[in-house]
């Protein structure tokens, strides 16, 4: 038989073990609202649950829920009413809006469940955390609102109009759960996914999440975001219990756990601002509450937008980059030419010559240069020699024929003055008599005659009466003996296509094709259509490397500049792959110790270090401890050990559903449970006059634990 002393020691041990639990304190942001500032509060509703008010994905950038329906009402179960007006009214639930809400930094204190040390809970049937705060705070300096008192059922005035947000994170180890019961709106996001959706003013509703069913990876960190709104009288009940090991890894400059700097108002930023600059809120990790002195000035670099044909400048009013007005990208170096700019064809190029004349359009005979802004004509066939007769042969250049000076006297030397063009016939001294028989000539040939040699009458000279050589290799020079006239016939070149006329090269005498479609732009590929139309297409500068920007400039040709790959977030490193282009990889954050895990967090603004989580094989029964000195994880049993973790021998010792003395099996354990069977023992204990524990209501023997602890005495074990 157990002695009375032993009974007392057992009872005392159980009582102390229940009361010595640890608390967890979580910072929360509560925004005081009012029906006077937001019509979504005290809105008519039939006290029923409405799902779908928020979208299934959290806005990751500021960790806020996204309203479902834009400028439309939220869905409702009541055809005559709605529960949210629009995205504008919803915005002030979880964002600071001066005059509409008042942010209040507060905290929730979670108690540890003694049945299961992993579980922490928060519960109150009267959840009014900001009574006499917010708009009613004596220190509130904003515009006062004329709000009536809203009374509870027991005729006490409370603040029934507020929204709360709590942010944390956790390393998933397995077996975690989250349970909620309460009113009104509640949304829970894990890893940015909506896992609990209890929308609209309603009576207390329950929801649970088994994290093992969410596809999470053990040892990986995940965000946890909790949103709660009280929007209607006359109750405010909340109960939360969870085995998720939530932690606040950092606080932003607003004092919010894992916040995104929502309290920042760029209109309050202080500093030197350039004419085209604008303020941006600082990253959450600046480590100071003086955010207004740490704002980041953003100024657009408009030169990055410049193209070959357009330059940009910043508009100081709109603070955006705009094209410069009245700026001609094609500055004329020659006022006789017209240029246009084409992004596709590589910049400025000549499209039209102002110096043009139909009479002087043959480029083989004429040039039309622009000199000091004036068009001039250069006649290529004109030479100063008066003894040369020059003409233009269209398409074949210049013909230069010598003036014929002949007196048909073999005793004279015939010449021409290049200055005056006058013929001279100088007599040869001691000219020898001519042997007419020897040097007889054909008088009918007017191109060539045979004359005696004035210096040697035993020989004759063949004299050209007409010199038809015009000095142009692109003509066939022929003298007609009957008439003595020259024919300088152009070389005939075969036509290749409808655009490009062939012509003879005066230097070589050979036919060449002059590219009439050549626009003198190295950034265009020129071709000719069947109908004789010139076609100019953009030159293909693609080098096959996806890490280069390939383009053409009229003064250079193809250019291949390296592209700049920008990362999508502070936690990604951008690089370039010649086959794939820009790619990203996660940034590697260095850790300073074995028991610290370095991770990059976008919300934090970069790398941060957290305590390493050691994952036991059975998280329900053990917890891990990291040792920097040994660089190992060790695991220890929870003390007291939850009933589900007890050995078979201990569990077998539970007689009739009672627990062996000294083993914590529930929040309310009486000594009589060790002496009597489960139900019989409990009934006997309850029948004892005035024998009640203050904690017995927390976890009664025959009711499930509201704090997620397993009650092994819920049913008597089979006999």
Swiss-Prot record:
Keyword field: Glycoprotein, Membrane, Signal, Transmembrane, Transmembrane helix
Extracellular side: 22-653
Annotated membrane topology: Single-pass type I membrane protein
InterPro entries according to UniProt: Fibro_Slime (IPR011874), PA14/GLEYA (IPR037524), PA14_dom (IPR011658), Prespore-cell_inducing_factor (IPR051154), S_mold_repeat (IPR001673)
Primary site of residence: membrane
Keyword Transmembrane: yes
Subcellular location per the Swiss-Prot or TrEMBL entry: Membrane
Domain PA14, chain residue ranges per copy: 112-260
Tagged with keyword Membrane: yes
Cytoplasmic side: 675-719
Glycan attachment residues as annotated in the record: 46, 59, 86, 113, 301, 372, 435, 457, 562, 628
Signal peptide region: 1-21
GO cellular component: extracellular region; membrane
Segments passing through the bilayer: 654-674
PANTHER family found in the cross-reference section: PA14 DOMAIN-CONTAINING PROTEIN-RELATED (PTHR31137:SF12), PROTEIN PSIB-RELATED-RELATED (PTHR31137)
NCBIfam families in alphabetical order: Fibro_Slime (TIGR02148)
Entry's family note: Belongs to the prespore-cell-inducing factor family.
Name of this protein: Protein psiJ
Native species: Dictyostelium discoideum
Gene designation: psiJ
């Amino acid at each position: 038989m157990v002695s009375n002393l032993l009974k007392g020691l057992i009872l005392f041990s159980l009582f102390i073990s229940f009361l010595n639990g640890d608390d967890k304190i979580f910072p929360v942001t509560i925004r005081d609202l009012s029906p006077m500032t937001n019509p979504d509060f005290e809105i008519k509703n039939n006290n029923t649950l409405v799902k779908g008010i928020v979208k299934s994905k959290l806005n990751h950038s500021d960790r806020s829920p996204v309203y479902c329906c834009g400028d439309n009402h939220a869905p409702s179960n009541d055809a005559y009413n709605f529960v949210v007006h629009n995205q504008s009214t919803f915005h002030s639930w979880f964002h600071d809006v001066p005059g509409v809400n008042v942010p209040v930094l507060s905290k929730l204190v979670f108690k540890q469940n003694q049945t299961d040390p992993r579980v922490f809970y928060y519960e109150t049937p009267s959840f009014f955390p900001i009574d006499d705060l917010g708009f009613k705070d004596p220190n509130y300096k904003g515009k006062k609102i004329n709000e009536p008192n809203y009374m509870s059922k027991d005729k006490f005035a409370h603040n029934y109009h507020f929204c709360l947000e709590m942010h944390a994170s956790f390393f998933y180890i397995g077996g975690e759960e989250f349970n909620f019961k309460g009113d009104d709106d509640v949304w829970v996001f894990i890893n940015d996914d909506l896992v609990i959706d209890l929308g609209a003013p309603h009576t207390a509703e329950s929801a649970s999440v088994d994290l093992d069913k969410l596809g999470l990876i053990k040892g990986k960190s995940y965000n946890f975001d909790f949103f709660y709104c009280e929007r209607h009288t006359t109750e405010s009940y909340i109960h939360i219990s969870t085995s998720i090991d939530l932690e606040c890894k950092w606080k932003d400059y607003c004092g919010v756990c894992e916040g995104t700097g929502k309290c920042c108002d760029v209109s309050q930023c202080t500093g030197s601002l350039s004419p085209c600059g604008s303020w941006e809120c600082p990253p959450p990790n600046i480590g100071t509450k003086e955010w207004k002195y740490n704002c980041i000035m953003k100024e657009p670099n408009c030169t990055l937008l410049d193209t070959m044909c357009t330059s940009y400048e910043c508009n100081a009013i709109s603070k955006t980059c705009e094209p410069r007005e009245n700026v001609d990208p094609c500055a004329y170096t020659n006022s006789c030419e017209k240029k246009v700019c084409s992004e596709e064809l590589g910049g400025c190029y000549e499209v039209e010559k102002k110096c043009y004349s139909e009479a002087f359009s043959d480029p083989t005979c004429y040039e039309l240069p622009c000199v000091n802004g004036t068009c001039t004509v250069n006649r290529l066939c004109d030479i100063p020699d008066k003894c040369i007769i020059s003409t233009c042969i269209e398409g074949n250049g210049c013909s230069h024929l010598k003036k014929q000076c002949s007196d048909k006297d073999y005793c004279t030397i015939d010449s021409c003055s290049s200055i005056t063009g006058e013929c001279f016939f100088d007599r040869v001294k001691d000219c020898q008599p001519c042997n007419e028989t020897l040097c007889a000539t054909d008088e009918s040939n007017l191109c060539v005659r045979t004359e005696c040699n004035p210096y040697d009458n035993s020989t004759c000279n063949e004299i050209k009466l007409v010199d038809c050589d015009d000095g142009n290799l692109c003509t066939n020079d022929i003298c007609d003996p009957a008439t003595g006239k020259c024919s300088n016939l152009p070389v005939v070149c075969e036509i290749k296509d409808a655009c490009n006329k062939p012509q003879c090269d005066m230097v070589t005498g050979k036919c060449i094709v002059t590219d009439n479609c050549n626009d003198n732009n190295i950034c265009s590929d020129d071709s000719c259509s069947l109908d004789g139309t010139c076609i100019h297409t953009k030159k293909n500068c693609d080098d096959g490397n996806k890490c280069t920007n390939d383009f053409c400039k009229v003064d250079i040709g193809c250019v291949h500049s390296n592209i700049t790959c920008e990362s999508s977030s502070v936690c990604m490193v951008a690089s370039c792959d010649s086959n794939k282009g820009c790619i990203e990889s996660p940034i590697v954050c260095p850790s300073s110790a074995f028991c610290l895990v370095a991770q990059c967090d976008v919300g934090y603004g970069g790398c941060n270090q957290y305590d390493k989580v050691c994952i036991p094989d059975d998280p329900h029964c053990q917890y891990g401890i990291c040792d920097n000195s040994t660089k190992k994880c060790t695991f220890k049993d929870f003390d007291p050990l939850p009933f589900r973790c007890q050995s078979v021998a201990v569990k077998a010792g539970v007689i009739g559903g009672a627990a062996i003395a000294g083993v914590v099996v529930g929040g309310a354990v009486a000594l009589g449970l060790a002496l009597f069977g489960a139900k019989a023992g409990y009934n006997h204990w309850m029948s004892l006059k005035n024998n009640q524990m203050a904690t017995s209501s927390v976890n009664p023997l025959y009711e499930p634990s509201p704090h997620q602890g397993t009650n092994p005495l819920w049913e008597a074990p089979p006999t």
